[in-house]
Amino acid sequence: PDHFDREAAEEFSARHKNALVYIPSRREPAPETLSVGNFTVELHRVRHTQVAGYGKSTVDAMIVSCEGNCVYVASDTAPEAAIHEGILAGRKPDAAFWNGEMLLYKPERALLHVCAEKSFIYHIPIDPQDGLRRKLERIVSRYPEELENVRLLAAYPSVITL
């Protein structure tokens, strides 16, 4: 609810005729998997992080696999280690993408180190003076050993090599 843009999704679909576009419906269960070519996407409908004014909502966390690589996209899942541990079920993806809230709590920070080879934090405000951005930067610098595999994505788009 906080940043879905139906018009942008429809424009993307019109420009990329061969792309599979999945737009979740909160009234229908998520499919367990989507497959396109060599890509497989596992969908896990879970609790969305708290968003003021929206009450309780859900989001689809995803595990994307292709040609031996695996990426976990936590989306805006609530920052609870148990949710992510349940989705990953002992798997260790090559990379994981997390909301910045995961850095705010000790059990969730610990998860970033053990649940993926590389962890990337997104939704980082672009303004270097933004309070949330500065707080996340301080947390990463405060726990260098615990967060050695964590990188803040402060520029969009970013190039990531697995």
Residue ranges: model-predicted function:
Residues P1-S25, L88-F97, L104:
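Active-site metal-binding motif and surrounding structural segment of the metallo-beta-lactamase
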Residues F4-R6, A81, K106, Q129:
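Glycine/Thr-rich phosphate-binding loops of Rossmann-like dinucleotide-binding domains
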Residues D5, V41, D76, A96, ...:
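Divalent metal-coordination and catalytic microenvironments
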Residues A8-N69, P144-T161:
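Metallo-beta-lactamase
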Residues S25-R27, V46-R47, G100-L103, Y122-D127:
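Short, acidic/turn-prone active-site loops that include or flank metal/cofactor-
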Residues R27-G37, K56, E85-G90, R109-L162:
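Binuclear metal-ion centers of metallo-dependent hydrolases, dominated by the metallo-beta-lactamase
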Residues H48-V114:
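Active-site-proximal loop/helix segments of hydrolase catalytic cores
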